[in-house]
UniProtKB/Swiss-Prot annotation:
This is Probable acyl-coenzyme A oxidase acox-1.5. One of its GO terms (molecular function) is flavin adenine dinucleotide binding. It comes from Caenorhabditis elegans. Homodimer. Its EC number is 1.3.3.-.
Length: 659
C-alpha cells in the first residue's frame, strides 16, 4: 500500500507520481502536525459529518458574490450550523468548533468570529461565578452574539489613552457608559457592524471622579429579539477592508448609556453597591483575553501558511513551464531551485510556527489557571513572549504566503487560487491586536531588564539565560551548533542595544529617550530573541518524534528552517569574527541541500496537512490536480458572463454604436 494515502485513480499523473515517491506515512506526519492521532481522528470524523449536511455549503464561490450576499451566506450557514451542530459535535469544545468553522465558514470570517475568539473567553476568564451562570451558556449556544470592544478611533495600541468612560452612579447602582469625543468611538471590533447583540466593552472605571483605569463591562447594544439598537447607543459598519470582508467590523458610541452595576466583569476587580473598589491581585490580570487571542493568532497563522503551501506546492508539481536544457521536455516548476527557494522555507516555517503555537497555547492555559489562583509569576514572561511571537509569526507567515502566491505566477493572482484571500487574512494580523513594531518594542522593554540583570551577574529566567551563556565552539551535534548561532545573534543584538542605550544615559540623556533613540536596534534584538525561541521549540519537537521516517523528514525541514533564518541574519554571524565567510557559506549550502532532500517528499508533506478541498477552496491546490479544466469552470461562474449586463447595455453599447 502506498505511503501517501491521497492517491486515487484518475488524478493528474504528475501529482500521482509525486505521491508515489513518499518515504513516510502521510497519516503519521498528519498526526504530528495536528497534535496526535486522537486529534486527527476527531478532525476527520467532524469533516465526514459536515459532508453529510448539504445545507452548510455555498452554491457559488465567495469571490463571485457581493459583500452583502456573502454576509447573508455566512449568516445562513451559521443559523443552520447552530441548529444541527449538537447532533455531531460538542459546541463547548474549542477544537470541534474550530474544525467545523474552518470547513463551513472558511477563513474570511462570520458573525461569531470575534464572539468565539474574544467574547466567550473573556466571560470565561473575567466573569465571576454568578455572571458566568447568567451569560456563558447563552453565548455558547449563540442565543446572544458578542464581540470585544477596546480599540477606539483615536487610540489602539496606547491603551492608557482610551477615552470611553464608565462612571458609577451610587444612587441607581448603575454605570453610565459615555463616549466623550469622536476619537473615543469604538472602532474595528468584528461583528459590531450588524451582528452583535452584546459587547465586552473596555472603558475607564470612574468612581467619585477618580479614574481606576480600564475595566471590562458586559454591555447589551441591540435587542436580541428585534435587533433594534438600544436607546443611547450608536452603532454601525465601517465598510470594506483589504480582506476578511465576511466580518462586519463596526463603530460604537454611547450617550450616557446606563447598565447595572453587576454588568462589570468582577472576577478580578469589584465595585460594591456603595462604590467601594476592590483591586485585582495583579494589575495586568485583564490581559488574559489578549494573551488567549495572541496564542490563537499564532496557530491560525501557521494554518494559513500550511494552506498556502499546499496550494503552491501541488500546483508547482502540476504546472510544467520552460526547459532547464533547451530542446528537452518542459519541466515541473517545482524542479527549479528558484521555485524551491521561494516556497520550501515557508513549508519549514509551517512546522516551526505550529510548534510555537502549541507551546504558547499551553503556556497561556497554565498562566490563566495560575492567575485564577492569584499567582501572576509567569505573566510578564508570557506577555513578552506573546508580543514577539505575534510580531514575528504574522510578518513571516504573510511574507511566505505572498511568496507562494507569486510562485504560482498569474494564476496565483486569481481569486480562484485562494492565495489572495490567504494573504489578506494573514497580513491583517500584522496590525490588529497590536501593531507589530509596537509589539517588538514591548518585548524590548522586557529584554532591556534582562540585559541589566545579565550585566550585574544576577540570576536569569530560562527564556533569557542565553544572555550569560558562552558560545559553543566545538560540537558534533548539528542542531546544537546551529542553535548556538541563534543564541549568539540574539545575545549580540540584545547586549549591543542595551550598551548603546546605557552610553547615552551616561551622557545625560533620560532612559526613555535613550531607549527611543535605539528602538530600531531593540526591534532587531526582539526579533532575534523570538526566532531563537521558535528554533529551540522546533528542534525539540522534532527530536521527540518516534516514527523514524517522519523524524527524517522533519529533521530535514528543521535544518532548512534553521539555516534559512541564520542566513537572513548572516551579518551578525560574521560580526566581530564569530564565524568566517567560509562558515557562513556552509550554512548557505545547507539550505540548498535541505531543499534538494525536501523536493522528493514536498507534495506528500503538504498532503499531510490533511486539508480537504472544501476547506482549501482553491482550484490550484485541488487534491486531484485537475487545475486547468476547473479554472475554466470557475471562470464560467462569474456573474459577468451573464447576458444583458447593465454596464454594457447602458454605456458601452450606446458608445460603440455611435462610433
Amino acid at each position: 500500500m502506498p505511503l501517501n494515502k491521497l492517491i486515487q485513480d484518475g488524478d493528474n499523473q504528475d501529482l500521482t507520481d509525486e505521491r508515489f515517491k513518499a518515504t513516510f506515512d502521510t497519516d503519521a506526519l498528519a498526526a504530528v502536525f495536528h497534535g496526535g492521532e486522537d486529534a486527527l481522528k476527531r478532525i476527520r470524523e467532524l469533516r465526514d459529518e459536515v459532508t453529510k449536511r448539504w445545507h452548510l455549503f455555498d452554491a457559488l464561490p465567495g469571490a463571485h458574490r457581493t459583500r452583502a450576499e456573502r454576509m447573508e451566506d455566512v449568516s445562513r450557514k451559521l443559523k443552520n450550523l447552530m441548529e444541527s451542530v449538537g447532533e455531531f459535535a460538542d459546541f463547548t469544545n474549542n477544537l470541534d468548533m474550530l474544525v467545523i468553522i474552518r470547513d463551513v465558514m472558511g477563513i474570511e470570517g462570520f458573525p461569531l468570529a470575534l464572539h468565539n475568539l474574544m467574547f466567550v473567553p473573556t466571560i470565561q476568564n473575567q466573569a465571576d461565578d454568578e455572571q458566568t451562570e447568567w451569560w456563558l451558556m447563552d453565548a455558547l449556544q449563540g442565543k446572544i452574539i458578542g464581540t470585544y470592544a477596546q480599540t477606539e478611533l483615536g487610540h489602539g495600541t496606547n491603551l492608557g489613552a482610551i477615552e470611553t468612560t464608565a462612571t458609577y452612579d451610587k444612587l441607581t447602582e448603575e454605570f453610565i457608559i459615555h463616549t466623550p469625543t469622536t476619537t473615543a468611538t469604538k472602532w474595528w471590533p468584528g461583528g459590531l457592524g450588524t451582528s452583535c447583540t452584546h459587547v465586552v466593552l473596555v472603558a475607564n472605571l470612574i468612581i467619585d471622579t477618580k479614574n481606576y483605569g480600564l475595566h471590562p463591562f458586559f454591555v447589551p447594544i441591540r435587542d436580541r429579539n428585534s435587533y433594534s439598537v438600544m436607546s443611547g447607543v450608536r452603532v454601525g459598519d465601517i465598510g470594506t477592508k483589504m480582506g476578511v470582508n465576511c466580518v462586519d467590523n463596526g463603530f460604537l458610541a454611547f450617550d450616557n448609556y446606563r447598565i447595572p452595576r453587576r454588568n462589570m466583569l468582577m472576577k478580578h476587580s469589584k465595585v460594591s453597591k456603595e462604590g467601594l473598589y476592590t483591586a485585582p491581585s495583579h494589575p495586568k490580570v485583564g490581559y488574559t483575553t489578549m494573551l488567549y487571542m495572541r496564542s490563537e493568532m499564532i496557530y491560525h497563522q501557521a494554518y494559513y501558511l500550511a494552506m498556502a503551501m499546499a496550494i503552491s506546492i501541488r500546483y508547482s508539481a502540476v504546472r510544467r513551464q520552460g526547459e532547464i536544457k533547451p530542446g528537452t521536455q518542459e519541466v515541473q516548476i517545482l524542479d527549479y531551485q528558484t521555485q524551491q527557494y521561494r516556497i520550501f522555507p515557508g513549508l519549514a516555517r509551517c512546522f516551526a510556527f505550529n510548534t510555537a503555537a502549541a507551546t504558547v497555547r499551553q503556556m497561556t492555559e497554565n498562566c490563566i489557571k495560575q492567575l485564577s489562583h492569584g499567582n501572576s509569576d509567569v505573566l510578564a514572561d508570557l506577555h513578552a513572549l506573546s508580543c514577539g511571537l505575534k510580531a514575528v509569526v504574522t510578518h513571516q507567515a504573510s511574507q511566505s504566503i505572498d511568496q507562494a502566491r507569486q510562485a504560482c505566477g498569474g494564476h496565483g493572482y486569481s481569486d480562484a487560487s485562494y492565495l489572495p484571500t490567504l494573504y489578506t487574512c494573514s497580513v491583517g494580523a500584522c496590525t490588529y491586536e497590536g501593531e507589530n513594531m509596537v509589539m517588538l518594542l514591548q518585548l524590548s522593554k522586557y529584554l532591556m531588564k534582562a540585559a541589566a540583570k545579565a550585566e550585574k551577574g544576577e540570576e536569569m529566567a530560562p527564556l533569557v539565560a542565553y544572555l550569560v551563556k558562552p558560545d559553543i565552539t566545538e560540537t558534533n551535534d548539528k542542531f546544537a551548533k546551529m542553535l548556538s548561532h541563534f543564541e549568539h545573534i540574539a545575545r549580540h543584538r540584545v547586549m549591543h542595544a542595551y550598551r548603546q542605550m546605557i552610553e547615552e544615559e551616561k551622557q545625560g540623556i533620560e532612559r526613555d529617550y535613550a531607549f527611543a533613540n535605539h528602538s530600531v536596534d531593540w526591534t532587531k534584538a526582539a526579533r532575534a530573541h523570538t526566532k531563537l525561541f521558535i528554533a529551540r521549540g522546533f528542534v525539540k519537537s522534532v527530536q521527540e518524534v518516534s516514527d523514524e521516517a517522519v523524524h527524517d523528514v522533519l529533521t530535514t525541514l528543521a535544518e532548512l528552517y534553521l539555516s534559512y533564518e541564520l542566513i537572513e541574519m548572516s551579518a551578525d554571524l560574521t560580526a566581530n569574527g564569530y564565524l568566517s565567510e567560509s562558515d557562513v557559506q556552509q550554512i548557505r549550502h545547507q539550505i540548498y541541500d535541505s531543499m534538494r532532500k525536501t523536493r522528493r517528499n514536498a507534495v506528500s508533506i503538504v498532503d499531510s496537512f490533511d486539508i480537504c478541498d472544501r476547506e482549501l477552496r482553491s482550484v490550484l491546490g485541488r487534491r486531484d490536480g485537475h487545475v486547468y479544466e476547473n479554472l475554466y469552470k470557475w471562470a464560467q461562474m462569474s456573474p459577468l458572463n451573464e447576458r444583458n449586463l447593465p454596464h454594457v447595455e447602458k454605456y458601452l453599447k450606446p458608445m460603440t454604436s455611435k462610433l
